[in-house]
Amino acid sequence: MSSKVITSLMAESILLSKVGQVISGYSPITVFLLGSILIFLVVYNKRRSRLVKYIEKIPGPAAMPFLGNAIEMNVDHDELFNRVIGMQKLWGTRIGINRVWQGTAPRVLLFEPETVEPILNSQKFVNKSHDYDYLHPWLGEGLLTSTDRKWHSRRKILTPAFHFKILDDFIDVFNEQSAVLARKLAVEVGSEAFNLFPYVTLCTLDIVCETAMGRRIYAQSNSESEYVKAVYGIGSIVQSRQAKIWLQSDFIFSLTAEYKLHQSYINTLHGFSNMVIRERKAELAILQENNNNNNNNAPDAYDDVGKKKRLAFLDLLIDASKEGTVLSNEDIREEVDTFMFEGHDTTSAAISWTLFLLGCHPEYQERVVEELDSIFGDDKETPATMKNLMDMRYLECCIKDSLRLFPSVPMMARMVGEDVNIGGKIVPAGTQAIIMTYALHRNPRVFPKPEQFNPDNFLPENCAGRHPFAYIPFSAGPRNCIGQKFAILEEKAVISTVLRKYKIEAVDRREDLTLLGELILRPKDGLRVKITPRD
């Protein structure tokens, strides 16, 4: 044996002896804990090194240690959306993917149909990102925020609630609340300019509350109600937590004044939903008992004055819980609250943007009015039927191109649970994938003159052959929006009611608007229009 080998063995023996002496001074529990920590650090460092290696191969701005791109993102709220879109234009135009670091967490931004499809079209990536965690106190594990098996189970339960025949029952609600909106707008006749957004938002809040819970909250008549204020307040706080890194810690957030407001809003929202669920269950129990006493198994479909009763989303959930599906009161509340959250802001944005764009383009507005005249004639009062709404094909094209330019949800986020090849780049597990809907819809290869409002983009002949992931205002793939048919019908009902009574003229110019890319894509200072009655 050579002297070098002997020397090496002696050195290792001395080292092991020293380590043994050090370890012998600690208890077995301490040694176990220290060993576990060491193993964790080694494994974490190995995985982290692998993640960084792959992420850094994706184009993107230089990042600082620990801070990532926080300095570039440390801008006013109304500038943040523009900054993110600017990064996409600067770093990702060639392959449709770029990356940023939020602190030590990587995010990839996707904005080409070919890079979006691998995420949205896979059952492997149905889990939403951590940005949705701030909705959990309100929505629990409803359809929007649930993951994996629970999401699959809930989706299966809820799909029948959006069947075409069920949606037909909601048309009367759309019409009645749209008529209230038209009456409320009458006070603005003669005004040089007013913000359309708040009027529409209160209308859609009335619609979604009545269709979700079967209860009227009269938001359009009483915008100061505690429930209405809570809906607005909780949305604002969620957006604040998403934008401000320090508020993303539950502990730090619990020390702020916003936390007390947050808890107050949650108590109001949950209290109202729980009350409605209890009352509705009691009503249905009485109806069932009366039917049994009358030896009649058919449901009592009429109220005391002979008017046909309307099913609400809540009723369908209660029925599902009776038919063997395990849904507790809390489960039902989660889904009702989710419907409330997803169903009012998104549709109000779509309606407001469409009316505004039609106000910018009177030539398209007149084509819509001609279509409405062909359906209703000179009649401005008769409510629309399901068939009437289905016949509003050009109006639907207008809504779709409005959603192309101003998608209600400008960004969607998913967790990458395993490595995936996107655009020739490996996106490692643990990354957040951000689908940039706003940028995706402005692809000149798909939509010539992408910044121009052009409803003809959605005529049947122009849609033929289009990539299925080039236009996704309601997301796409297995986790697409379950309520998209509901939304389009509601939007048609509201917009057609307004346009049958008023001519709309945009006061603001599109190029002067500042966009806020929050949970919902909003104009910072509203959408100012003027209206005149139609003869």
Curated annotation (Swiss-Prot):
Keywords of this entry: Endoplasmic reticulum, Heme, Iron, Membrane, Metal-binding, Microsome, Monooxygenase, Oxidoreductase
Transmembrane intervals: none
One cellular-component annotation, GO: endoplasmic reticulum membrane
Annotated binding of heme, by residue: 342, 481
Entry similarity comment: Belongs to the cytochrome P450 family.
Function in brief: May be involved in the metabolism of insect hormones and in the breakdown of synthetic insecticides.
Domain of life of the organism encoding this protein: Eukaryota
Keyword Endoplasmic reticulum belongs to the record: yes
GO molecular function: heme binding; iron ion binding; monooxygenase activity; oxidoreductase activity, acting on paired donors, with incorporation or reduction of molecular oxygen
Subcellular location: Endoplasmic reticulum membrane; Microsome membrane
Enzyme Commission identifier(s): 1.14.-.-
Name of the protein in question: Cytochrome P450 4c3
Pfam families reported in the protein's UniProt record: p450
Cofactors, names only: heme
EC class: oxidoreductase
Entry membrane topology: Peripheral membrane protein
Gene3D superfamilies linked to this entry: Cytochrome P450 (1.10.630.10)
InterPro entries: Cyt_P450, Cyt_P450_CS, Cyt_P450_E_grp-I, Cyt_P450_sf, Cytochrome_P450_Monoox
